[in-house]
């Protein structure tokens, strides 16, 4: 398969598979041994991390430009589908979900979101599944946010709205009418 030339520009948003969306801030040369190596310097603002990727390793690393809005819409649409079969034990499925998240591929992220989303506000989801779901959703939302010029939290909410994912139930919220009717005082016996 012929190698495709990836052309990146300073200021461009890019996706590094294991980190998500970052901004290419500059290119620089570093001397390693007796060789000069040209590097792409990528800043991941949210995680406060800077990554340097050697130019000759860009393709192998999986670094890519942002996906198109059309491909992102296709990924989100695929997340609306029916959850995949759960024939494997959880440990293997979790490892597969982790691999999909770290791929940085919007379609694979959508698979994780689709398979692990809650179907109703009262569904209970194990902590490890919820954590994987949140990571996949955040990675999708990072790219969605840049494509649609919004912040990541708003993008997460928008994706969940599109997918029809029920909002979390606030167990601390009390209906004002109920609050007035309830008497929690210790009356010392009735």
Describe each model-derived feature in a short phrase:
Residues 1-61:
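A positional/architectural concept
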Residues 64-190:
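Charge/polar-rich, low-complexity and marginally structured segments
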């Amino acid at each position: 398969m012929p190698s495709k030339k990836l052309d990146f520009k300073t200021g461009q948003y890019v996706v590094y598979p294991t980190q998500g969306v970052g901004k290419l801030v500059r290119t620089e040369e570093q001397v390693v041994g007796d060789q000069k190596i040209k590097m792409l310097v990528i800043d991941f603002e949210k995680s406060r991390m800077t990554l340097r990727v050697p130019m000759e390793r860009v393709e192998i690393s999986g670094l890519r430009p942002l996906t198109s809005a059309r491909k992102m819409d296709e990924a989100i649409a695929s997340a609306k589908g029916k959850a995949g079969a759960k024939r494997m034990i959880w440990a293997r499925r979790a490892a597969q979900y982790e691999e999909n998240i770290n791929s940085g591929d919007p379609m694979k992220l959508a698979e994780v979101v689709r398979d692990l989303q809650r179907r109703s506000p009262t569904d209970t989801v194990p902590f490890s599944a919820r954590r994987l779901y949140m990571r996949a959703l955040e990675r999708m939302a990072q790219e969605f946010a840049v494509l649609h010029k919004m912040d990541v939290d708003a993008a997460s909410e928008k994706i969940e709205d599109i997918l029809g994912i029920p909002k979390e139930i606030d167990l601390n919220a009390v209906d004002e009418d109920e609050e007035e009717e309830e008497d929690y005082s210790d009356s010392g016996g009735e």
